[in-house]
A protein has these predicted regions:
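Long, contiguous interaction/recruitment modules in multidomain scaffold/adaptor proteins
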Residues: 1-101, 105-118, 122, 145
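Helix-start (N-cap) detector for alpha-helical repeat units in TPR-like alpha-solenoids
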Residues: 93, 127-128, 161-165, 199-200, ...
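Position-specific recognition of the canonical hydrophobic site in helix A of tetratricopeptide repeat
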Residues: 104, 138, 169, 173-176, ...
Length: 261
């Protein structure tokens, strides 16, 4: 089978599943069939993930992997439902978010806030919209509102997925710029739970710890970053800064990697 045929064979679209649920109580108790709609996507390795559709016909909430055999047996394709309801809703949502992002980039933060709010009314768990609204608040210095978004983002694992890396980095930097150091530490700690071998996360955590005057943790994360990538110049320069300012413990001051010329 050719690569093109392989791509065409992958599962992607809206599917439905049915399950029997109890309705009522006592003498009125009965069973009925409940239909659920899902957005399914199969990756290059053949792993299928499903995500429920919310009442506004957009995929929302946590994704879950499902064995292919179970999927094929219990989920039915709904191409007409996708074309008539889901695709138009997803397209409109993405257009709203794109419009909001343009406003934010252009410095029109109040229009950005309005459009991100519109997007979140359609999908309150949309990662791009939550990041965008949070960044809008941070850029305005509205730390109270930004903290509300932070508390929402920190609970959603999709926040830390690779596809959102650029937004993730911007948000972390802006937390520090707004002196929200406790949130920045919690933010990077959550990310490190999911990606413990990411040297850049350890470096950013070191920056956040240093802002909190936690030198011990700063050094710990810098050393971890360099153990993962000994060529990480920004981490070497940070250690050199600590050394020059006599912030390294005496036992470590001569043992750290030197900054290369």
């Amino acid at each position: 089978m050719s690569e093109t045929e392989n791509q065409r064979a992958r599962i992607k679209g809206v599917f439905s599943s049915e399950k029997s649920v109890k309705v009522g109580a006592g003498a009125t108790l009965r069973r009925t069939m409940q239909t659920m709609y899902w957005f399914a996507d199969e990756d290059e390795q053949g792993v299928i993930t499903i995500q429920p559709l919310n009442p506004n016909y957009v995929p929302s909430g946590p994704k879950q992997e499902i064995p292919k055999e179970e999927f094929l047996e219990n989920y039915a394709p709904e191409p007409e439902f996708y074309s008539s309801k889901v695709y138009p809703s997803i397209r409109k949502l993405n257009q709203t978010i794109a419009k909001a992002e343009r406003h934010r980039v252009n410095g029109d933060t109040y229009s950005a806030e309005y459009e991100f709010g519109n997007a979140l009314r359609v999908d309150e768990e949309n990662i791009r919209a939550n990041f965008g609204l949070g960044l809008t608040y941070l850029e305005r210095g509205e730390t109270g509102k930004a903290d509300n978004i932070f508390q929402r983002l920190i609970k959603m694992e999709a926040t830390f997925e690779a596809e959102h890396k650029h937004l993730f980095n911007d948000f972390g930097i802006n937390l520090r710029k707004n002196e929200m150091y406790d949130q920045a530490v919690e933010y990077y700690a959550k990310a490190l739970e999911l990606s413990p071998a990411d040297e850049n996360l350890h470096y950013n955590m070191a920056r956040a710890c240093f802002a909190k005057a936690d030198i011990e943790k700063t050094i710990e994360h810098l050393r971890t970053a360099l153990s993962l990538n000994n060529n990480l110049e920004i981490a070497k320069k940070f250690l050199e800064y600590l050394r020059k300012n006599k912030l390294l413990p005496q036992t470590l001051s001569g043992a750290e990697p030197k900054v290369s010329n």
